[in-house]
């Protein structure tokens, strides 16, 4: 392709029009075949746990040591080095539990994990030939070597339920919880049907009844708490249902972290609701430059006026929360986990990059 393009440019400068035209045709044809092949090469991509790279590195180091007979003179040193390399594999995380809001574009996918077990809250969107589950959720789960024990669906809109069928194929033993009568639920999402998982309590706050096709107002609202810190998951809950929750639960709505209802739309995040939840941080799952212009500037300013720290996946990338015995920490992909190299020099930008 590249030689054909260079020759085409050269012959164009030499006024060899027909020869240049033929070379442009060759370059175009080669690119068409390349992209055709790339579509099928996608199946060869392997998503592997992070530990695999460590094992691979240890293997290569071992081969090099044997080949150069380094081990004969420094055997004790080699044993120490290999022991140090293996130590991260057996190191337990210092946090008790973790919540990740994945960057799935316009949609929602949240992973709650404790050790190597996980529960999913929503599964992102599905489109014609793929889904957020295939492109984002599965790679994340495999990278962290997580087993999905359960899936909670907030409601039936594609950007929340789209990846469900694919995830159920990959994790057939995972239980399902929703407020829909059209799904084969293992557990129904109904207010006050609370449950425990690991050391976490899942307080189910909404809805009060099951429906065949849950809409925004029927979103499965769950407050996850370890007794000290809590995360409130709201799906696409709207203003009317927020008022109902305020009337019923009042100060019990207070949570450390709030998943912003309905991607930061003006249909949600009412003042009374925010005052009672009173979170430290609010997390919004919304794509950059989406056609709905979410989150709304009006809502963003409302959170800021209430001194609530506001984060958006479209700007901050994946948002990760780590909960410890007496504290918690938040990290974002673009600022803390994997920042752009120039942020170290010039600092982070306040606008979309």
PLM features: what roles do these ranges have?
Residues 1-100, 111, 281, 302-311, ...:
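Transmembrane helix-bundle segments that form internal channels/tunnels in multi-pass membrane proteins
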Residues 4, 100, 119, 152, ...:
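Hydrophobic/aromatic beta-strand patches that form the interior of the parallel beta-sheet core
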Residues 94-139, 143-144, 215-238:
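Conserved beta-strand hairpin/beta-sheet module of binuclear metal-dependent hydrolase folds
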Residues 108, 144, 149, 172, ...:
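Envelope-exposed proteins and targeting segments
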Residues 150-152, 156-192:
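Active-site HxH/HxHxD metal-binding segment of metal-dependent hydrolases
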Residues 175, 179-203, 210-216, 288-353:
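Binuclear metal-ion centers of metallo-dependent hydrolases, dominated by the metallo-beta-lactamase
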């Amino acid at each position: 392709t590249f030689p054909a393009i260079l020759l085409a440019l050269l012959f164009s400068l030499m006024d060899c029009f027909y020869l240049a035209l033929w070379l442009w045709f060759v370059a175009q044809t080669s690119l068409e075949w390349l992209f055709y092949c790339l579509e099928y090469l996608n199946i060869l991509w392997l998503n592997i746990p992070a530990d695999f790279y460590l094992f691979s590195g240890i293997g290569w180091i071992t081969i090099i040591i044997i080949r150069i007979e380094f081990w004969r003179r420094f055997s004790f040193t080699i044993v120490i080095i290999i022991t140090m390399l293996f130590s991260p594999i057996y190191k337990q995380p210092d946090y008790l539990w973790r919540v990740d809001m994945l960057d799935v574009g316009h949609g929602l996918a949240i992973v709650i994990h404790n050790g190597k077990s996980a529960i999913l809250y929503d599964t992102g969107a599905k489109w014609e030939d793929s889904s957020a589950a295939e492109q984002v959720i599965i790679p994340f789960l495999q990278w962290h070597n997580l087993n999905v024990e359960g899936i909670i669906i907030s409601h039936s809109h594609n950007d929340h339920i789209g990846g469900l069928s694919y995830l159920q194929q990959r994790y057939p033993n995972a239980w399902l919880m929703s407020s829909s009568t059209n799904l084969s639920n293992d557990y129904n999402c109904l207010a006050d049907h609370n449950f425990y998982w690991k050391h976490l309590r899942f307080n189910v706050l909404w809805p009060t009844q099951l429906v065949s096709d849950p809409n925004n107002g029927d979103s499965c609202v769950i407050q996850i708490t370890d007794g000290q810190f809590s995360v409130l998951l709201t799906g696409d809950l709207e203003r009317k249902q927020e008022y109902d929750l305020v009337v019923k639960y009042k100060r019990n709505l207070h949570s450390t972290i709030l998943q912003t209802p309905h991607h930061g739309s003006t249909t949600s995040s009412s003042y009374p609701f925010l005052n009672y939840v009173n979170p430290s941080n609010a997390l919004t799952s919304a794509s950059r430059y989406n056609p709905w212009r979410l989150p709304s500037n009006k809502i963003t300013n409302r959170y800021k006026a209430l001194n609530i720290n506001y984060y958006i996946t479209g700007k901050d990338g994946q948002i990760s929360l780590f909960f410890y015995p007496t504290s918690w920490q938040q990290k974002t992909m673009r600022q803390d986990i994997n920042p752009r190299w120039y942020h170290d020099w010039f600092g982070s930008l306040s606008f979309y990059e």
